[in-house]
Amino acid sequence: MLTAITGINWGDEGKGRMVDLLSQDYDIVARYQGGDNAGHTVKNERGKFVLNLIPSGILRPDVVCVMGGGMVIDPEHLEKEIAALTEKGVEISPKNLKISDRATITMPFHVAQDGLEEERLSKTGAQFGSTKRGIAYSYGDKYMKKTLRMGDLVHMDASVRKRLETIVESKNLTMVNIYGQKPVSVDEMWAWCERYAKLFAPYICDVGQFLAEADDAGKKIMFEAQLGALRDIDFGIYPYTSSSNTVSAYAPIGAGIPGRKLALSIGIMKAYSSCVGEGPFTTELAMTEADKDALREHGHEYGAATGRPRRVGPFDAVASRYGVQCQGCDELALTLLDVLDYMEEVPVVTAYKLTDGTTTNRFPTGKTLDDAQPVVEMLPGWHCDISGVRKFEDLPAAARNYVTRLEELVGCKIKYISVGPERDACIVRD
């Protein structure tokens, strides 16, 4: 059985928290895209964990985690992430962590170029709000066939050295002539690769074969997405997107088994909206600065990977309905409902008003989205602590009505409702 856990919005919806909860019923959890540019935060009895590269299932001792070929992997960051997990008592070995030999390596020059380009663009206000982790440049070089893959670390021979020389020669045309930097050293990059070859070679394998055999044997496999539908390179708010496909249809492809079909798609969405980075974010126009500050503080809305304050706003039903459609959701998980406990009234964006005076509940693109204004519906708040509730019928009537109203607006059943950061702070509806 293949299940995808994906984000409905801009990312930061709480996917890691839900993967950690639901993975107790799965054998394998696989990441299929992205790099270390976003963090999945999980809290359990052992403390707080922020996972950037490793699937959230790693916190379950009986789960095997897979880093798929659709990912871009910075070995330096992966080493630190493994060390941080190990320090907290999480056991990691090639038995429970497998890295695709097809995954792209994020090299030091990718990270450097990302920072330099964002700095250059910021001088004219044209920056994208990059995390400066080298993600776009890793994917760009992947498609231009000018980088190495994790499988190359297993065979560090003369042919790999020759390819690296060609890659560095090409990269130096940019680093020296555009950014005025010192040339990248082939010897330094080779030594860097050798270091991580020794460290990660035992983890690197053909994960496609592993996943196919597991699926054939009836194992339950969960695909864990990074970011959300609105950050998808094709279906997101271009160019303010990530550089990979975050949608569920890509999950089997990026994980390593492109011929297999999903049995279940579970979308994760917040009870309100948040966003890191540049680009149109219509829902934030529906709140005063003071109200946004209050929501940000109650929700602790700061990027898990960057620490940057997130932009916030009411639940955006227009964007969420589009995200549900993009992800082909069978059911939804609504996270952070408890964050709204303090509100007397809870705003919801139900439509967008366009410059021609019309309103729409369809998510627009381009200039139409840039100029859209939110249409807001106010719902009664419940103004009490719901963090201890474990049954839907025990929620205050206003909270139940809020959940059912969101279901109506996005057109999909909400099965899971998280009411706190702890592993068991979740309501499961029949």
Model-derived features with residue positions:
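Non-transmembrane, aqueous-exposed alpha-helical and coiled segments at domain scale
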Residues: 1-430
